Structures are given as C-alpha cells and as structure tokens.
From Swiss-Prot:
Keywords: ATP-binding, Cytoplasm, Kinase, NAD, NADP, Nucleotide-binding, Transferase. Its cofactor is a divalent metal cation. The lineage of its organism: Bacteria, Pseudomonadati, Pseudomonadota, Gammaproteobacteria, Alteromonadales. One of its GO terms (cellular component) is cytoplasm. The active site is at D72. It comes from Shewanella oneidensis (strain ATCC 700550 / JCM 31522 / CIP 106686 / LMG 19005 / NCIMB 14063 / MR-1). GO terms for molecular function: ATP binding; metal ion binding; NAD binding; NAD+ kinase activity. Involved in the regulation of the intracellular balance of NAD and NADP, and is a key enzyme in the biosynthesis of NADP. Catalyzes specifically the phosphorylation on 2'-hydroxyl of the adenosine moiety of NAD to yield NADP. Its EC number is 2.7.1.23. This is NAD kinase.
Amino acid sequence: MTTKFHTIGLIGKPHHPGTNQTLKRLHHWLTMQGYEVLVEERVATELGPHIVAVDLLEIGERCDLAIVVGGDGNMLGAARVLARFEVGVIGVNRGNLGFLTDLPPDAFEEALAKVLDGEFDTEHRFLLEAEVYRHGQLKASNTAVNEAVLHPGKIAHMIEFEVYIDNQFMYSQRADGMIVSTPTGSTAYALSAGGAILTPNLQALILVPMFPHTLSCRPIVVDACSTIKMVVSPENGENLEVSCDGHVHLAVLPGDEIIVRRSSEQLRLIHPKGHNYFHVLRSKLGWGSKLF
C-alpha cells in the first residue's frame, strides 16, 4: 500500500481527560509533520486555540484519514457516519476492550508514522440497515456497524415475533429479543449471547435469539445478502425498540415489521501493517491462549 494521507481528522470522547491528553499529543505531532488537521467540534474546544473545528460530516468529506481516540463505542458512533465516505478510519484505544482501536495511547507515534507513510492494511467492514415499518409505511431507520437488536424496553420481559429470511418463514420466537449481527459485531453483544465468531472477511450475518423460551433454538448464520424480516406479534406490549449498536433506538409497536439488511455503506478500517485478527482475539478476549 503506497497511499499517502494529507488531511487528517481527529475524533474523540468529549470531557474525558485521557482522551483529551491523547488528542493534544496527536494534534501537535501531526501538525509538526505538516499535515492539515481537522478536529471534531465536540472536542475541539478542549484542545485550546488555533484549532480547526468541524463536524463529523465535514471530516468525512475532507479528510483522507480519521483517527478516533476512545473505545469501541466511540469508534462505532464515528463509523456509522464516516462509512458513507471514502475516508480511512483508525483508532487509538482509550476505552476498555478496544477491539476496533489498534493503537496504544501512550506509544502511538511509531505505528502511526508507518501508517502515514503508506504501510498499513485495509479492511472493508459492511454495515446493516435497520428499518421499522408500520402498516406498510417506513417509520424509522438507521445503520449499525455491529448489530441491530429487537428487544423489549423493560428488563426480563419476553416478546413474541416471527422471523423470515428472504420472505421465507424461518420460525416463531418467544424470547427476550433477537440480535442480527455483522461479522464485526460477532465479537460483541452477539458473542455474549452465545453466538459464533465470524471472521471479518465473511460475507455473512448471524442471528442470535436472546434467552429463547425453548430447549432447541440455536444461532444461525445466513448469507450477508439475505433480507431479515421480524414481524412483532400484535399481542406484545407497546414498549419495544430496535437498537443499532446500542446507541440509536427505533421505537417499535405491536404488529410492526422490522427489516434488517446489508447496507450499501462500508467502513474503511485501517490497521498497522501485519495486523492479525486472531492475535486480537487472543489478546483482547483471551481466546484459545497457548497452554505451553
């Protein structure tokens, strides 16, 4: 990879001391090397004067690379917006797990310098589009990087719904909800609910029922081009919703139909050269660690 970057956007978690410190270091380090640096307006005021503050959309439009400082939640929030542009996205971990944020906050310079010099790997992660229909009319929609989840608004309350794959009836469910996850999200909420890990290059979705009231129901993997339809029973209560990455919530009423399909948008995720997904699984999740 020989692509060079010229304009770089900085994105971070507002009012977070560790993030603020890393953003200041990044801004100074990048400007000293001659890069044009744009800072998301939510954090720009915390970095002092002489900062070019823009919104997230302008970062997507003008930047070659966006650096997200924070945890996976910050990365997901930025990714849902930036995926509609061609901008590459890389993360500096200032969160807990940091599954999508590769660079260490206290020693990012060496790895980032190589990335900026064109030594990096690129992954394209597809997103989901979630839509809520009521009496045939679209009522709400949004995108998700990790997962779209149908669930009740109150804890420990079962709901009833039917699931269709490409308009073919699959099954009826009585459960706490349903997770429809991308490969990116298969190491997140879907994993906690008992779903399989899908490697990022798979063109697939995984459907994971949440606490189904049955002894036989298991997660299922389907083609990424499939259209998932969930029809909510009219007998359910009214406090239902679809959550996209746990950040955006779409209201659902009894009788509504939820359509989840692959979005046309893709996140262009940048990794340092030699990025190893299985090493990330071992180091972040303690997966399959060597015994000797």
